[in-house]
C-alpha cells in the first residue's frame, strides 16, 4: 500500500538507484537520476518564490523532463497542469486564462506568447539539472492538496480543470496495485502512450512509480507516423499495454502486434472509451493468453471507478461488455431522476462517491455545483452516464445521458464542437452529430452546417467549402474534434422551444 507517492519514489531511488524508471527508444533514466534531477528542478522552483500551493502549467510531450518536472513540483507543494505539445494555441491560452498558473515550465516551445507569467525554458531545466543543487522537502503535496489538474472540454467551449488531490490519487493507485482484476506484477514494464494531459496516462505512471517499474515512452515525432509508431511498439519489451481501445485497433493493423512477436506483453488495460466486443475478440485472437481489463470512470473520479477482467465467455455472452466491479472504497450507485438509488437491473444515471471524487473544477464554482454533490454523506459526482448493476454487482454501461461523447479516446462535448464551428466566418449555424456503429461506439463525427449568405456562390464544390471551414477554425480547434463529414442545409430543424433539434439529427444520421 502506498501512503505517499513522493516518499515511494524516494524509496525506490534509494533501494534501486540504477533501475530504469524511463526508457525512450533506449535512452534510459534511472530512479536515482529521477531523484537527483527532480531535486535540482525543485531547487530552481523554490528559488522563484511562487505563491504557496499555486498551480504550475507544464507544456510538452512524453519526455523524461516532463516527468522530472512533475515530481519536482510535487516536492515543492505545487499542483501541475499537464498540457500536451499538440494542443491548439487557443486551448493553451484558455487553460492559462482559467488556471492562472504562477509559473509555466515549457519543456517544448510554447505556441503562444505569454508576458504576464514567468516561463521556465527547457534550457533552464537543463541548467538546473547540471547544477545538481541539493533540495530538502519542507512542504510537499499532501492529503487534500491538489496533485495535478487535468483540463477536459467544456459545454461552452471553455475547458474545465479537474482538480485531483494527493488523497484522490492514492485511492486510485492503491486500488489498481492491489485489485485482483488488474493483477499487476511487481516492477511493471508499461507502455507510456496516452499524453500526460489525458488522465488515462495516470493509469500507467501511477502504478509504475508505485511499484518501481519502467515507463516506455515514444518521441513526439513518432505520434503522427503510424507505420513507424506501431512497428516500434512491436519491438518494445513492454509487459503492460495501457491505451484507449481505438489505439489498440490501430495497433492491430500491424501483423507483428501479436503474442508470437511480443511474448512479454501479457496485460492490456483499457479506459477512456467503450471497449467493444469486436475489439476484445480481435485482441484475444492476437494474444490468446492475455489479461484484458476493461476499466471505466470519469476524470472527475480519478481515472476509473470500476474494472473487470474480460473473459472469452463474456465476448460470446454480451453485446456490450461489462465495465466492471466498483472500487471497494468508492460506493457507486444507479439513481433515477429524483436522485433515488435504484435496484439491480434498473437503469439510471451512474454516480460515484468516496475518496477518489475530485473537489471540483478549478476556478469554476458554477460548473462544480452542477456536477458535484453529497450523497449518503460522501462527496459524489454525476457521471452523466446511463448504467445498471447486475445481481452480482457488475456495472453495465448504457450510453450518455446528454450529448457528451467519447471519440478516439477523448471526451468531447458536442456543443463544444458546434461552438467552435460557429466561429468560422463562413458559417451561419452548425451542429455536431455523432454516428454510431452497431456496437454503440462513436464511428465518426458529422457536422450539419447552414452557410452565411453568399458563401456558397464563392465555391465550385461542397468539398472546397469544407476545406475552407476547416482552415478557418484549425487554430482554435483540436484536430480530434474536427468532424469528418460536413452536410450542408438551408436550415436546421428546431424543437418547440426554438432550439436546434439535435436528437432529430442524431436519429437521422443513425437511421440512414
UniProtKB/Swiss-Prot annotation:
Record-listed ATP binding positions: 152-153, 294-299, 385, 397-400, 499
Binding site for D-alanine: 199, 303, 499
Alphabetical list of Gene3D superfamilies matching this protein: 3.30.300.30, N-terminal domain of ligase-like
GO biological process: lipoteichoic acid biosynthetic process
Protein localization: Cytoplasm
Alphabetic keyword roster: ATP-binding, Cytoplasm, Ligase, Nucleotide-binding
EC number: 6.2.1.54
Gene Ontology cellular component annotations, sorted alphabetically: cytoplasm
Domain of life: Bacteria
Protein name listed in UniProt: D-alanine--D-alanyl carrier protein ligase
Organism of origin: Streptococcus equi subsp. equi (strain 4047)
The gene coding this protein: dltA
